[in-house]
């Protein structure tokens, strides 16, 4: 009987779902994570709002709605290359939710998503790594793999998205 139990345990461990692949949780975006997201996520839209203070020593605050369709309810992994304390609030489909922040990823559990349309809202403090801030202006060149240093997103080129950006800036500034 012990032999049967051992064999069953081995079989169960061999049948782990793709989300149990530890490489998808590595820093950066592993090939496994990129392939998993490409298969499961579509109709991706970002609605990003950034509040940029005049003083460059003050943080840039932001909020983002990440909207997408899933082929099935599952764990969702967003990229954010910042410290965990920069994440202020997370909700999924209109409800406050728990999440894990690990290795530059915001990990939302399966029970927070649904097959079909999903809306993830995150309030955060933007990272400064890719923001070039001067006394009179701010600009950024978000070359590949740098968007996640400013705001949470799915940072991979094969996931195309529509994008809206709203800027709250000092009245004497002009956004171009």
Predicted segments with their positions:
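A surface-exposed beta-strand-loop module
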Residues: 81-138
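N-terminal, polar/Ser/Thr-rich
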Residues: 8, 15-61, 134-136, 155-157
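Surface-exposed coil/turn segments at beta-strand junctions on protein surfaces, enriched
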Residues: 55, 71, 101, 113-115, ...
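Surface-exposed beta-strand/loop patches in extracellular or lumenal glycoproteins
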Residues: 63-84, 155, 163-170
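Extended, low-hydrophobicity, Ser/Thr/Pro/Gly-biased non-transmembrane segments
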Residues: 123-176
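Intrinsic-disorder/low-complexity, polar/charged segments enriched in Ser/Thr/Lys/Arg/Asp/Glu/Gln
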Residues: 43-47, 59-65, 73-75, 105, ...
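Beta-strand-rich interaction surfaces with strong enrichment in secreted/lumenal proteins
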Residues: 49-51, 66, 96-97, 107-112, ...
